[in-house]
């Protein structure tokens, strides 16, 4: 029996060492990590489409019934419109867009965490973050930010060094959260990868690598300027590989992560929908206030490859990034309420009819990656830092980065246009 136990232990150790040679290998570790992320994005892109379309249809039917009920109760028209076109439609869009990708992404991410792979990702990222003047634990909080930036900011409490913790908090919003992923996926599919979900997954992977590079760059700048210091030692005990309990993981991730993020977004989206409805139905100089605001912002947005409607949609989408696209559609179509599209083809036709090109889409992708954190993340940053100064800096850093990159991108497009024979 003793010999048998020893042989079993030897087999387990050998298996772990073999896996670690691949997962932690100098030439194999990073490619495996990138392929896993690309696979997760591909599953999320493919799997979220049909449930999202079904939920959009379902909520549209419920909205029709709700409108009929309010009409039967003789509710005043303005109040009925406020409840259905303002609050309800905003909430239904957020749920239909957020829930399907979250229901896929969070369990997949949790499986990687449960089987012991995520600490090995942190091991790979430790060298990168050390060169940026921080520690590998920031890599874990960066991974957490893929699900929710607010959760990533809260997770920064695991970093012992106050300086490195603050850097991690200030740069966490450079990672695209689950609220931004549907918009990124939609734009990538419509303008850059209409014929291949595999190519769309790799474009998403490139965007993720781009955002990670920006995180490292800004972290390095902070550690060499206002937050100087030496990186602390990073002690990481690699856990053994475990067979994940798939059923328990799915239930737990949906309950503790997906529903938590969704409920928080709903709480924020309801008053946001009311505010947007007021702007849409208040007239100034014979046009809705919201369109007047978009016209005012147009000259400011043009140098960055966007129009006033795009910039205003991002501003009004501060409570929840999920409502940026429907806000754009509402203003482009002048419907007075947020519009739902049945498929990407219809959405693409509307955007191109309003002047969108692939250059516009590229600028919106960059600005989606790098702009101010959502309201929930801002509140979380203030709670974690206890400082308005650091909260404002956490807002300014990604915003300035986004505007700068969009401006540089436009200059690149102008240079390319001057040499059509080459390009």
Predicted regions and their residues:
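Interfacial helix-loop-helix hairpins and adjacent transmembrane helices
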Residues: 2-7, 222-258, 420-423
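Transmembrane helix-loop junctions at the membrane interface of multipass transporters and ion channels
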Residues: 178-203, 376-387, 408-419
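Core transmembrane alpha-helical segments of multi-pass membrane transporters/permeases
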Residues: 30-39, 70, 74, 78-111, ...
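Switch/coupling subdomain of P-loop NTPase systems
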Residues: 1-20
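Transmembrane alpha-helix detector for multi-pass membrane proteins
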Residues: 100-112, 118, 133-191, 368-379
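Extended, low-charge hydrophobic alpha-helical regions
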Residues: 49-90, 107, 132, 153-168, ...
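Juxtamembrane inter-helical linkers in multi-pass membrane proteins
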Residues: 61-69, 119-150, 228-251, 332-346
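Alpha-helical transmembrane segments
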Residues: 201-218, 317
């Amino acid at each position: 029996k003793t010999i048998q136990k020893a042989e079993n232990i030897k087999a387990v150790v050998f298996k772990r060492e073999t896996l670690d040679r691949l997962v932690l290998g100098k030439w194999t570790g990073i490619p495996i990590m990138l392929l896993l992320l690309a696979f997760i994005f591909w599953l999320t892109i493919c799997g979220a489409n049909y449930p999202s379309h079904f939920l959009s249809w379902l909520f549209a039917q419920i909205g029709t019934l709700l409108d009929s009920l309010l009409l039967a109760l003789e509710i005043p028209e303005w109040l009925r419109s406020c409840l259905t076109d303002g609050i309800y439609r905003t909430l239904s869009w957020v749920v239909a867009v957020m829930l399907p990708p979250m229901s896929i992404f969070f369990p997949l991410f949790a499986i990687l965490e449960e089987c012991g792979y995520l600490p090995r990702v942190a091991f790979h990222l430790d060298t990168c973050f050390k060169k940026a003047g921080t520690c590998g634990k920031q890599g874990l909080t960066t991974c957490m930010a893929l699900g929710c930036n607010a959760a990533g900011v809260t997770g920064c409490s695991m970093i012992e060094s106050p300086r490195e913790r603050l850097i991690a908090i200030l740069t966490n919003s450079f990672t695209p959260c689950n609220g931004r992923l549907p918009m990124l996926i939609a734009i990538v599919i419509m303008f850059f990868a209409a014929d291949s979900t595999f190519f769309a997954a790799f474009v998403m992977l490139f965007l993720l690598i781009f955002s990670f590079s920006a995180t490292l760059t800004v972290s390095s700048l902070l550690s060499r300027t206002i937050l100087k210091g030496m990186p602390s030692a990073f002690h990481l005990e690699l856990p053994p590989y475990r067979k994940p309990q798939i059923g328990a993981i799915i239930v737990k991730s949906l309950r503790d992560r997906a529903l938590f993020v969704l409920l928080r977004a709903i709480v924020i989206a309801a008053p946001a929908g009311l505010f947007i409805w007021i702007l849409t139905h208040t007239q100034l100089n014979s046009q809705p206030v919201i369109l007047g605001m978009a016209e005012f912002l147009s000259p400011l947005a043009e140098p960055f490859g966007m129009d006033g409607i795009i910039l205003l949609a991002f501003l009004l989408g501060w409570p929840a990034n999920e409502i940026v696209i429907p806000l754009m559609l509402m203003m482009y179509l002048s419907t007075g309420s947020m519009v739902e599209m049945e498929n990407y083809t219809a959405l693409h036709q509307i955007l191109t009819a309003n002047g969108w090109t692939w250059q516009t889409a590229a600028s919106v992708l960059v600005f989606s990656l790098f702009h101010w954190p959502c309201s929930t993340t801002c509140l979380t940053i203030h709670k974690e830092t206890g400082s308005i100064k650091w909260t404002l800096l956490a807002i300014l850093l990604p915003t300035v980065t986004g505007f700068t990159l969009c401006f540089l991108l436009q200059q690149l497009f102008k240079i390319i246009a001057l040499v059509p024979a080459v390009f």
